[in-house]
């Protein structure tokens, strides 16, 4: 089954509520009442106002070659008033250096820095079935931070704050937007996509962009094949208080027989938990009293799991060979923190799955973010892939305008698809393969992955290559 799914991936890759409107403009105002039909024409409509969709709207609005385009951002949720609370949210993202660069170029990063974030300067990943580990140190690899931990709602607030600034005059936002359906153009030369709303409003656009998540209605309207499956695992998240105050700039991940458990630093005393485990175990974790939950979590981080004597002997021998060549043998390691308590009501669970749209584009349509691809959170790459989509799509649209072409010109949309699939697909395959490799506990498999981990940890160029791909 595992081999079949991996082969399938490779083969396919080869071949009614009230609506509130905010107008981010001094000249383009729009009525959005429930009385009768109102048809508005836009150059670009973005379906989905999450982190990726809002960032794309901001990127288009701030690009000098694209700022003349009339853009509509449709968000299904009502407009939320953000307030920075003393306690951290339980949903966070690990932003890469490339994502930071994108946010800085759009003047979004300053809003995040003025609120709060936590840099990750070290990362340690180790196997509970063999104790083989790999560690990354920002000073040794990139001379910069490995990642930045930011709360989802804070990031979205920062993007919206910049998006609604007076600098951006060509973007309209409709909150509480309930879309009833799409009529998509069949040909590039006559791109005229229709978006129908539940309240009777109708919008048309040259370019429709689906940023509407893993269950994308835009992707469904395109009629493209979407390869997807569930992992029969759930992710359990929570906000944790550490037993001792530390610098806390290390991200920890331990591979258990049931899946990875990870701690992401928030500040000197708190960390965010992402624990991937079986559905049955996850449901039990969510129901446990707080003290029992903390005990089980500390066991997951510290407990000694049974090791195969043959695997231990082979990894010890291989470690001594590495040491004889002056390479690190993996014996030196940091110890993870102990957990003191869990923030009340911070525990939550969500399903885990894989998704790959075989096409990111159609005439006058493009997909970004989870609408195009979905990955397991074990490598923290999901949202970074989406922000990479934003960067590339904005650049290709600007290039098309610079060349005197329409933003729906097929060759330029094709360039976007090719560029992103060349980056996203290998990442998706690698993450899926890692998940499958580490959820098998047979001694021969444990031995192979342990030796591979030891070798990778010993070879700095390979570690640099891994980090280079992860941050682009």
Write out the residue ranges for each language-model feature.
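Conserved FAD-binding catalytic core of PHBH/FMO-like flavoproteins
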Residues: 103, 201-202, 207-332, 336, ...
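Glycine-rich FAD pyrophosphate-binding loop
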Residues: 45-47, 61-91
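C-terminal helical "tail/cap" subdomain of flavin- and related membrane-associated enzymes
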Residues: 332-334, 395-472
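FAD-binding beta-loop-beta segment adjacent to the flavin cofactor pocket
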Residues: 349-367, 425-426, 442-446
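Conserved N-terminal helical subregion
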Residues: 115-221, 227-239
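Beta1/beta-strand and adjacent pyrophosphate-binding region of the FAD-binding site
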Residues: 34-52, 72
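N-terminal FAD cofactor-binding segment of flavoenzymes
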Residues: 85-128
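N-terminal mitochondrial targeting presequence
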Residues: 1-40
């Amino acid at each position: 089954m595992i081999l079949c799914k991996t082969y399938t991936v490779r083969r396919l890759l080869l071949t009614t509520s009230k609506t509130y409107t905010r107008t981010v403009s001094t000249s383009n105002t729009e009525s959005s009442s429930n009385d009768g039909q109102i048809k508005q024409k836009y150059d670009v409509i973005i379906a989905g106002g999450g982190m990726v969709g809002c960032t794309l709207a901001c990127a288009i609005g701030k690009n000098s070659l694209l700022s003349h385009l009339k853009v509509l951002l449709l968000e299904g949720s009502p407009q939320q008033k953000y307030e920075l609370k003393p306690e951290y949210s339980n949903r966070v993202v690990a932003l890469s250096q490339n994502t930071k660069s994108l946010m800085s170029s759009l003047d979004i990063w300053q809003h995040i820095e003025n609120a709060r974030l936590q840099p990750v300067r070290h990362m340690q990943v180790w196997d509970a079935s063999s104790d083989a580990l790999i560690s990354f140190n920002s000073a040794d690899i990139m001379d910069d931070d490995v990642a930045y931990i930011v709360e989802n709602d804070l990031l979205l607030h920062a993007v919206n704050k910049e998006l609604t600034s007076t600098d951006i005059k060509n973007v309209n936002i409709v909150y509480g937007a309930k879309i009833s359906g799409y009529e998509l153009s069949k040909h590039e030369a006559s791109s005229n996509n229709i978006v129908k709303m539940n309240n009777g409003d109708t919008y048309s656009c040259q370019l429709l962009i689906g940023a509407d998540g893993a269950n994308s209605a835009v992707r469904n309207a395109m009629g493209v094949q979407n390869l997807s499956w569930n992992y029969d695992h759930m992710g359990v998240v929570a906000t944790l208080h550490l037993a001792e105050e530390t610098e806390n700039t290390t991200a920890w991940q331990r591979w258990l027989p049931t899946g990875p458990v990870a701690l992401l630093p928030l500040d000197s005393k708190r960390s965010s938990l992402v624990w991937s485990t079986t559905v049955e175990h996850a449901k039990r974790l969510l129901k446990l009293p707080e003290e029992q939950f903390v005990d089980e979590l500390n066991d997951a981080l510290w407990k000694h799991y049974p090791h195969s004597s043959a695997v231990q002997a082979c990894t010890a021998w291989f470690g001594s060979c590495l040491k004889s060549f002056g390479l690190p043998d993996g014996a030196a390691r940091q110890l993870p923190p102990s957990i003191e308590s869990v923030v009340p009501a911070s525990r939550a669970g969500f399903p885990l799955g894989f998704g790959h749209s075989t096409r990111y584009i159609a005439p006058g349509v493009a997909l970004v973010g989870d609408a195009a691809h979905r990955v397991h959170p074990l490598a923290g790459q999901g949202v970074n892939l989406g922000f990479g989509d934003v960067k590339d799509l904005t650049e290709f649209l600007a290039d098309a305008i610079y060349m005197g072409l329409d933003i729906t010109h097929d060759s330029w949309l094709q360039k976007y698809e090719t560029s992103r699939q060349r980056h996203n697909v290998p990442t998706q395959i690698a993450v899926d393969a890692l998940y499958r490799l580490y959820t098998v506990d047979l001694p021969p498999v444990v031995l192979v992955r342990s030796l591979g981990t030891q070798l990778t940890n010993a070879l700095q160029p390979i570690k640099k290559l891994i980090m280079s791909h992860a941050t682009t």
